[in-house]
């Protein structure tokens, strides 16, 4: 059963009326309602606040990494473990083909249903997850296979065990190693890009965001609690933090924005997957055509945080 957010309620009501008209066999009413639905979708999605975009990024029906992998990857073979401690369920990795192109996909997976969410730790990787990602990225480099990374995490797991096993070191090591991989790499934020948990698989030749995704150094709830000592000020925090694709593109922190279907990825997973595939293949062609893509990757990383100040 589909989940609707508060600002999507009118859309739900119209869709319910369309279904009712189909049952009654009233094709004329159906046509009128479909036109009304199109107008309402355009009205709602063209006037979203930053907080509403955050809600969409966290939408329970939004496609997760495993959903995209099932839709885009052929002959998929899962790769497990970090060869040091364990196999972290929050990080998934598959070898397969995207439209005939051999590729390795690494993703952060939140899971669906109570049992699966617990197994995936709600998409919050432990250090062994990041070490697993690095091991598989080095494997991709060894066999000259391009890498697609799907970011979707509220953040790296902050538990005592994770800290004892070197959470910060694992993230830092990934930043260092991923910046030097001698293969084309593409990272896409598909939902939430939470702080270091996202950065650990976010260093790439291309960093893009799906239209209704977010990327931030801390959750808006955490920001509101720290700045105003009031977690209820989440809407103000979301706006102030500038976590949407448009704001991050304006700041040159991401390369591209991948458009989603008009009704959002949570209503059209196949359409969103098609947009993701098109972007990945286009980016791959561009990167392969660049003479010094490693240097370009380095230069872009070094440009982060730089600014000019006028007198």
UniProtKB/Swiss-Prot annotation:
<keyword id="KW-0067">ATP-binding</keyword>
<keyword id="KW-0275">Fatty acid biosynthesis</keyword>
<keyword id="KW-0808">Transferase</keyword>
<comment type="pathway">
    <text>Lipid metabolism; malonyl-CoA biosynthesis; malonyl-CoA from acetyl-CoA: step 1/1.</text>
</comment>
<keyword id="KW-0443">Lipid metabolism</keyword>
<dbReference type="GO" id="GO:0003989">
    <property type="term" value="F:acetyl-CoA carboxylase activity"/>
</dbReference>
<dbReference type="InterPro" id="IPR029045">
    <property type="entry name" value="ClpP/crotonase-like_dom_sf"/>
</dbReference>
<keyword id="KW-0444">Lipid biosynthesis</keyword>
<comment type="subunit">
    <text>Acetyl-CoA carboxylase is a heterohexamer composed of biotin carboxyl carrier protein (AccB), biotin carboxylase (AccC) and two subunits each of ACCase subunit alpha (AccA) and ACCase subunit beta (AccD).</text>
</comment>
<comment type="similarity">
    <text>Belongs to the AccA family.</text>
</comment>
<dbReference type="InterPro" id="IPR011763">
    <property type="entry name" value="COA_CT_C"/>
</dbReference>
<dbReference type="GO" id="GO:0009317">
    <property type="term" value="C:acetyl-CoA carboxylase complex"/>
</dbReference>
<keyword id="KW-0963">Cytoplasm</keyword>
<dbReference type="GO" id="GO:0016743">
    <property type="term" value="F:carboxyl- or carbamoyltransferase activity"/>
</dbReference>
<dbReference type="GO" id="GO:2001295">
    <property type="term" value="P:malonyl-CoA biosynthetic process"/>
</dbReference>
<keyword id="KW-0276">Fatty acid metabolism</keyword>
<dbReference type="GO" id="GO:0005524">
    <property type="term" value="F:ATP binding"/>
</dbReference>
<dbReference type="GO" id="GO:0006633">
    <property type="term" value="P:fatty acid biosynthetic process"/>
</dbReference>
<dbReference type="Pfam" id="PF03255">
    <property type="entry name" value="ACCA"/>
</dbReference>
<keyword id="KW-0547">Nucleotide-binding</keyword>
<comment type="function">
    <text>Component of the acetyl coenzyme A carboxylase (ACC) complex. First, biotin carboxylase catalyzes the carboxylation of biotin on its carrier protein (BCCP) and then the CO(2) group is transferred by the carboxyltransferase to acetyl-CoA to form malonyl-CoA.</text>
</comment>
<dbReference type="InterPro" id="IPR001095">
    <property type="entry name" value="Acetyl_CoA_COase_a_su"/>
</dbReference>
<feature type="domain" description="CoA carboxyltransferase C-terminal">
    <location>
        <begin position="36"/>
        <end position="286"/>
    </location>
</feature>
<protein>
    <recommendedName>
        <fullName>Acetyl-coenzyme A carboxylase carboxyl transferase subunit alpha</fullName>
        <ecNumber>2.1.3.15</ecNumber>
    </recommendedName>
</protein>
